[in-house]
């Protein structure tokens, strides 16, 4: 999924995929009070963990062309997305001017509020850098630096 907001190597991803597939049944069931099955929402409560959003496996609309010739169809997560047309339009156009978090599913806008992740502030070489890095995220800090430049605080 090009716009999956799941954390890299998320241990709950299969569970979440099944949860989304059965969203209607789950929403109608009496669940454990205050239980949140999403590790990511708990992680993003602490701003120091926000760079993880840039370390996840989604692909920006602007970077999809790097996969040309590797597959014929790109799958987008829109089943429970609040604005599926926004997602489809951005990926069909190959560009998006706005809060990158609005394209992801789940949409993490509320977790990052009052900030937005301005997609136009992500550097052009971002894809090449993160797709070829050694994933030493604890010491590299590239994603943290990009995030600080791309975050815009809204009033």
Q: For the regions a protein language model found, what residue spans apply to each?
A:
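Active-site pocket-lining/capping segments in soluble small-molecule metabolic enzymes
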Residues: 1-155
């Amino acid at each position: 999924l090009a716009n999956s907001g799941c954390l890299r190597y998320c241990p709950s991803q299969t569970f979440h995929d099944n949860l989304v597939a059965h969203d209607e049944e789950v929403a109608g069931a009496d669940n454990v009070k205050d239980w949140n099955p999403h590790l990511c929402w708990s992680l993003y409560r602490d701003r120091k963990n926000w760079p993880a959003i840039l370390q996840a496996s989604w692909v920006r609309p602007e970077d999809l062309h790097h996969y040309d010739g590797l597959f014929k169809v790109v799958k987008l997560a829109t089943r429970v997305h609040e604005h599926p047309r926004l997602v489809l339009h951005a990926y069909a156009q190959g560009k998006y001017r706005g809060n990158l978090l609005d394209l992801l599913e789940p949409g993490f806008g509320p977790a990052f509020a009052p900030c937005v992740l301005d997609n136009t502030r992500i550097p052009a070489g971002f894809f090449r850098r993160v797709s070829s890095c050694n994933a030493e995220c604890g010491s590299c800090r590239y994603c943290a630096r990009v995030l600080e430049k791309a975050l815009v605080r809204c009033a």
